Amino acid sequence: MIEQDPYRIADPDGLETPAMVVFEEMVDHNIAALCDMVGGAANLMVHVKTHKSEAIARKQLAVGIAGFKCATLRELEMALEAGAPEAILAYPMVQRRKVERFADISATYDDRKVYAAVGDPRHVDVLAQIAQNRSQKLAVMVDLDVGMHRTGAGLDEEATALYSAIHAAPSLICGGLHVYDGHEHFRDPSARNAAAQRHVDDLKTLKGLNEITEDEKSI
């Protein structure tokens, strides 16, 4: 049990607000507990929107967490600035200026794995066009809708058509699949595992999604 009583802000009036103030030992404890829950830090791709803090991202990196999910381009930059070797912008982009900025970030960190989620042919089109104009290759992940109904292609011909569109674009590389099952709130691990397995089984029925090119293997 971590005691909270010893924590006091020595000079409250000297603290400029708003500011994020945390119990550092609790943050460290929670990061370690999360790694234990999933069998090791290497099995995690953590979402930075819960803290939006480069300092906490560095703590996560220090224990071996390598993958980071981001909701905004600024979060993506933050994770990469902290040293993340792999990061995905989990919300698809359609605005050209955002895609241009994503391309800039990808070019700056071309020694990392930086992905954009795509869930619709329009996302593929704008990314492919801008990447081609810049003579640049951009990495993407196919965003799949497994029941949240917020973003992503359906687990049917939508997904296979999207996957085919990516392969048809010379300036894009498909780095894998992205799924968010936020509609499921099972507390029981066995129920969570069963739901996840159903999604895996559904994916196996989609022809073409398991055909990985040599470029994709090396991304």
What are these regions (language model features)?
Residues 47-186:
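Active-site-proximal beta-alpha core segment in soluble small-molecule metabolic enzymes
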Residues 16, 23, 116, 155, ...:
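Residue-level preference for long, well-ordered alpha-helices that form the structural scaffold
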Residues 2-7, 26-56:
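N-terminal glycine-rich anion-binding loops that anchor highly charged ligand groups
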Residues 3-22:
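Generic N-terminal amphipathic, Lys/Arg-enriched alpha-helix
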Residues 187-219:
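C-terminal active-site-proximal or functional interface alpha/beta core segments in diverse enzymes
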Residues 37-42, 168-173, 205-218:
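A structural motif corresponding to the C-terminal end of an alpha-helix
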Residues 14-15, 28, 98-100:
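Expand to "…catalyze enediolate/carbanion chemistry for C-C bond making/breaking, isomerization
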Residues 25-33, 161, 198, 202-205:
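A non-catalytic, amphipathic alpha-helix used as a structural packing/dimerization or gating element
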